[in-house]
Amino acid sequence: MMDNARQFLTIYENSSNYSERLLSLYNGLFLLLGERLYDEAEKCGVDKASFLDALKYIREDEEGGKTILDEENLEALYSLLSSLLTA
C-alpha cells in the first residue's frame, strides 16, 4: 500500500496537469487514510466541500480548465501525503 501511495506522490511531483495532480493526491491519500481522508485534509486547512467539488468537477469536465483548489491547498495535501509516507 505504501509503495502504491509513493507512486501517486511521484505522479504529483512530475505533473503540471491540475487534474492529474489532484487525482494523484486523492488516490494516494485514500489508500493510506480511507474514509478519514477528508477529516485529515481539513486538519491541514483544505475545506472538505471544496475538495469534493474539485473532484466532482474533474469527473464532469475532463478538460480541467477550471481550478477549484488553489496551489496552496494542493501543497497542503501534498505535505499531508508526504508526512504519512515518512512517518
Predicted regions and their residues:
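Amphipathic, oligomerization/interface secondary-structure segments
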Residues: 1-87
